Amino acid sequence: MHCPFCSAHDTKVIDSRLVAEGDQVRRRRECQACGERFTTFETAELVMPRVIKQDGSRQPFDEDKLRAGMQRALEKRPVSVERLEAAIGRIKHELRATGEREVKSRVLGELVMAELRKLDEVAYIRFASVYRRFQDLNEFREEIERLSREPSKP
């Protein structure tokens, strides 16, 4: 790393510590040329995969769009913002854990449905009705029956 004071390229790390709950490394460095000390911070670059839509188009993962869809399903339901944010974090973690550069929107939709089912069954049905394009009352009934037959995964 080059020195911000004299632009020399020969710097030495004299101390490293984890900060931000282990998500960042703070390093104290010393320039070998001028002797000045400075601090750097290191974080992992977490790149989210692109989303392949049903029509084949590709777009960047949009956390705001994910949050808005889940909030719409959870509207007027007794689920805290903290629980919603934790669910979003788990979805993002699952997407990154695939190791893929691109993921089909269907995979993302199924992850959202699984998280909503854990949060609130009414929100799950709301989301499923739009996501799976329910056409009539029977489709709602079938999904509710399936929901009551299959235990929710923690």
Curated annotation (Swiss-Prot):
Listed cofactors: Zn(2+)
Zinc finger (unnamed): 3-34
InterPro entries: ATP-cone_dom, NrdR-like_N, RNR_NrdR-like
GO biological process terms, semicolon-separated: negative regulation of DNA-templated transcription
Keywords of this entry: ATP-binding, DNA-binding, Metal-binding, Nucleotide-binding, Repressor, Transcription, Transcription regulation, Zinc, Zinc-finger
Domain ATP-cone, chain residue ranges per copy: 49-139
Cofactor binding: number and manner: Binds 1 zinc ion.
A GO molecular-function descriptor: DNA binding
Pfam families the UniProt entry points to: ATP-cone, Zn_ribbon_NrdR
Similarity-based family: Belongs to the NrdR family.
Cross-referenced PANTHER family: TRANSCRIPTIONAL REPRESSOR NRDR
Job of this protein: Negatively regulates transcription of bacterial ribonucleotide reductase nrd genes and operons by binding to NrdR-boxes.
Name the record gives this protein: Transcriptional repressor NrdR
Lineage of the species this protein comes from: Bacteria, Pseudomonadati, Pseudomonadota, Gammaproteobacteria, Pseudomonadales
